[in-house]
Regions:
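Acidic, metal-coordinating helix/loop segments flanking the phosphotransfer/catalytic sites
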Residues: 31-49
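The feature encodes the CheY-like receiver
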Residues: 57
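Alpha4 helix (beta4-alpha4-beta5 surface) of REC/receiver domains from two-component response regulators
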Residues: 63, 85-100, 108-111
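Active-site residues of response regulator receiver
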Residues: 53
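Short amphipathic alpha-helix used as the core "switch/output" element in two-component signaling
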Residues: 62-75
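Two-component/phosphorelay signaling modules centered on CheY-like receiver
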Residues: 11-29
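Conserved acidic carboxylate
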Residues: 8
């Protein structure tokens, strides 16, 4: 079972995704930008997949992905970035494996997770 860490500053989105992914059998943890040092929280959660929004309140998802890709203990992490604005090129250049344009259908996310 894959462990997925969700990072978003939208409580509603977090709860919706947590419920949908849980129903599909995934182990899900959530992380908000208010949770302190995001990198420490990612390490502590030890996920297989990180689904992260580009905009996390006062933190930037692109910067976090760049930090992950330069951290030897985290560079194996599969990263899915999401935003309501098409930032595909920026996300892939930062080190994301996949970009999802919001709103997306749950089946799109499930297909990516199964790939």
């Amino acid at each position: 079972m894959q462990k997925i860490l969700l990072a978003d500053d939208d409580d509603t989105m977090l709860m919706l995704l947590k419920t949908l992914l849980g129903l599909e059998g995934y182990q899900v943890a959530t992380l908000m930008d208010k949770a302190g040092d995001i990198m420490d929280n990612i390490r502590q959660a030890n996920p297989d997949v990180l689904l992260i929004d580009i905009y996390l309140g006062d933190q930037n998802g692109l910067d976090i992905v760049r930090q992950i890709r330069t951290s030897p203990d985290l560079d194996h992490l599969k990263i899915i970035m999401a935003s309501g604005v098409d930032k595909t090129e920026e996300c892939l250049a930062a080190g994301a494996n996949v970009f999802l344009l919001k709103p997306y259908m749950p089946n799109e996310l499930f297909a990516i997770l199964r790939a």
